[in-house]
């Protein structure tokens, strides 16, 4: 019996019919706290990694090796005043930051950490993740409009166009995963990647979706960078043009909530990419399968997040027209063509996804 089963059985005996509700709340709280800690130290890792790329040390003053820097940053933001522009729409202005964070947290309900370790193992998990993650664009538009600022509204309009443009390509990439796995359940998608010729010979990583669906994987990940408005797709903020985009009139914790949502969405994109294309909790080689699955998932997510940071430190910002051209004239045709190719592939004698 696993640790979770032991806790579940003991709690059921102690609290009776109230236990399922209490257990669900405890799991949600644990996941939320872990995500917040991950965001705090992801920001530190980003600053450290970019510092090393610049031949600098990065943050190293607060605590040993700078490990307490995230706590200092949080305290600083908590103590700052939330200043509201006089011309802003009060309630919409305050609701917008909350609306960005809530969908980012909600997606984690369906992401499996390892076999049988998921908050809600729903059959339409992939559809749920896509639907919930697309809600964030409304909060960005709301923030730009409620601030009653031309700069903020311009940033919000850019964000809306950019996010909608790349969601279409991401959607087609996920259709390919649905076609090959035959399920919208994220746990079943991971299980579908554990079969095949290479998996049968102990080389699991060659059976994952990244290899046969490589164009979709590349499109999904780059579109994820654009969806989170990260460099080189950060024309929404565009420091040299419109300063901070839709966040220009926010301060204190209201400002911090936008960045919290951005970094949570980075982790979500990486976790979904690892789940859909990199085998989720599956070990790369069969002889390593004794290591808990959550270790492999965390390792894959960490690697993808490091790519996010590497891209930020390496590439210059694209012009707005270049971003639109990439989404509509490159990524969309590539994913549509690959859907057709995989469809014919699955109907041919060379079908590698036969269960």
Curated annotation (Swiss-Prot):
Transmembrane spans: 25-45, 91-111, 126-146, 170-190, 205-225, 253-273, 290-310, 330-350
Record keywords, A-Z: Cell inner membrane, Cell membrane, Membrane, NAD, Quinone, Translocase, Transmembrane, Transmembrane helix, Ubiquinone
Keyword Transmembrane helix appears in the UniProt entry: yes
Group of enzyme by EC: translocase
Catalytic activity: a quinone + NADH + 5 H(+)(in) = a quinol + NAD(+) + 4 H(+)(out)
GO cellular component: plasma membrane
Compartments where found: Cell inner membrane
Biological-process GO terms, alphabetical: aerobic respiration
Annotated GO MF terms: NADH dehydrogenase activity; oxidoreductase activity, acting on NAD(P)H, quinone or similar compound as acceptor; quinone binding
Membrane protein topology class: Multi-pass membrane protein
Enzyme Commission number(s) from the entry: 7.1.1.-
Main location: membrane
The keyword Cell membrane appears for this protein: yes
Family annotation (HAMAP family): NDH1_NuoH (MF_01350)
Protein purpose: NDH-1 shuttles electrons from NADH, via FMN and iron-sulfur (Fe-S) centers, to quinones in the respiratory chain. The immediate electron acceptor for the enzyme in this species is believed to be ubiquinone. Couples the redox reaction to proton translocation (for every two electrons transferred, four hydrogen ions are translocated across the cytoplasmic membrane), and thus conserves the redox energy in a proton gradient. This subunit may bind ubiquinone.
Family note: Belongs to the complex I subunit 1 family.
Subunit structure: NDH-1 is composed of 14 different subunits. Subunits NuoA, H, J, K, L, M, N constitute the membrane sector of the complex.
Name of the molecule in the record: NADH-quinone oxidoreductase subunit H
Species this chain originates from: Burkholderia multivorans (strain ATCC 17616 / 249)
Gene name of the encoded protein: nuoH
């Amino acid at each position: 019996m696993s640790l979770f089963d032991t806790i579940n059985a003991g709690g059921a005996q102690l609290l009776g019919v109230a236990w399922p509700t209490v257990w669900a709340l405890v799991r949600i709280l644990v996941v939320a706290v872990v995500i917040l800690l991950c965001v705090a130290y992801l920001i530190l890792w980003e600053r450290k990694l970019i510092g090393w790329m610049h031949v600098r040390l990065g943050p190293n003053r607060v605590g040993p090796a700078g490990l307490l820097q995230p706590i200092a940053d949080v305290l600083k933001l908590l103590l700052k005043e939330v200043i509201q522009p006089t011309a802003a729409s009060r309630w919409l202005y305050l609701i917008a930051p909350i609306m960005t964070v809530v969908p980012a947290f909600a997606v984690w309900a369906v992401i499996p950490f390892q076999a049988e370790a998921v908050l809600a193992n729903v059959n339409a998990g992939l559809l749920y993740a896509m639907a919930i993650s697309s809600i964030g664009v409304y909060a960005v538009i709301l923030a730009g409009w409620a601030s009653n600022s031309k700069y903020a509204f311009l940033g919000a309009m850019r964000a809306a166009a950019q996010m909608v443009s790349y969601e279409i390509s991401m959607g087609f990439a996920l259709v390919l995963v649905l076609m090959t796995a035959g399920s919208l359940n994220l746990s079943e998608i991971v299980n579908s990647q554990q079969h095949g010729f290479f998996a049968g010979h102990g080389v699991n990583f060659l059976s994952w979706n990244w290899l046969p669906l490589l164009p979709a994987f590349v499109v999904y990940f780059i579109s994820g960078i654009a969806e989170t408005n990260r460099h080189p797709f950060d024309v929404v903020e565009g420091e040299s043009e419109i300063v901070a985009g839709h966040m220009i009139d926010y301060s204190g914790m209201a400002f911090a909530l936008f960045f919290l949502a951005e970094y949570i969405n980075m982790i979500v994109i990486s976790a979904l990419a690892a789940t859909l294309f990199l085998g989720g909790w599956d070990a790369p080689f069969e002889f390593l399968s004794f290591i808990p699955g959550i270790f492999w998932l965390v390792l894959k997510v960490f690697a993808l997040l490091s790519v996010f940071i590497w891209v930020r430190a390496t590439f210059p910002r694209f012009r707005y027209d270049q971003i639109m051209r990439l989404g509509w004239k490159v990524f969309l045709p590539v994913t549509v063509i690959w859907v057709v190719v995989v469809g014919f592939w699955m109907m041919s004698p060379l079908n590698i996804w036969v269960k």
